[in-house]
């Protein structure tokens, strides 16, 4: 992609609309009609996080191509994340208290929450983005684009088992998945979920001006 300025107003508009959809996804039933409810909550709403991830990687890749360092971006992101973590500390404390765990495990619990799950279920996204970005940068460096693509797709497919676990209940893989879930709670994280979308945004920037996206194709 070249360095000329591009109009990003549509991207911003979609980000705003998807932000609203994220709120709706975490709300109760939206519509009485099953089809409409599914369309908004389970279809359109579930597109929000992938969209944000792809946009993030797209612009981070652009900064790299322009010779800019992304360290400042991630420093600012970590500062904001730390601020929101502090705000949610009381919530996290009462959550751990509700689990009736020994006080000795509170500090390790807070550390795990900060580095992995987020102090609130709304904060998981930031550590997942950071870890996912580190993973694809490392993979691209050592195994190249093709190897990275294969790896992140395999990781994503493994992570998808959380959603479709009913299909593996009679297999030997199910006990392994159950053990993983009992420890790590979810596959919606920086290892299994975010890398594939971050790589998509990364490659989208690289191929944005190729015939794949610019050449009109008649149906």
Predicted regions and their residues:
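Membrane-cytosol interface segments of multi-pass membrane proteins
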Residues: 1-168, 214-218
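Specific transmembrane alpha-helix
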Residues: 49-63, 125-137, 172-212
């Amino acid at each position: 992609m070249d360095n000329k300025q591009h109009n990003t107003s549509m991207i911003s508009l979609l980000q705003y609309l998807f932000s609203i959809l994220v709120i709706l996804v975490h709300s109760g039933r939206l519509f009485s009609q099953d089809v409409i409810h599914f369309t908004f909550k389970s279809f359109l709403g579930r597109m929000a996080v992938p969209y944000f991830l792809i946009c993030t990687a797209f612009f981070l890749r652009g900064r790299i191509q322009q010779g800019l360092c992304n360290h400042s971006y991630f420093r600012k992101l970590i500062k904001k994340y730390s601020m929101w973590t502090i705000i949610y500390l009381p919530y996290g404390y009462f959550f751990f208290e509700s689990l009736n765990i020994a006080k000795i495990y509170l500090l390790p619990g807070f550390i795990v929450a900060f580095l992995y799950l987020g102090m609130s279920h709304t904060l998981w996204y930031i550590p997942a983005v950071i870890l996912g970005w580190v993973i694809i940068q490392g993979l691209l460096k050592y195994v190249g684009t093709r190897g990275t693509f294969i790896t992140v797709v395999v990781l994503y497919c493994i992570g998808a088992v959380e959603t479709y676990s009913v299909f593996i209940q009679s297999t030997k893989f199910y006990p392994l998945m159950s053990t993983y879930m009992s420890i790590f709670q979810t596959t919606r994280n920086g290892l299994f979920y975010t890398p594939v979308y971050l790589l998509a945004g990364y490659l989208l920037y690289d191929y944005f001006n190729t015939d794949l996206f610019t050449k009109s194709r008649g149906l």
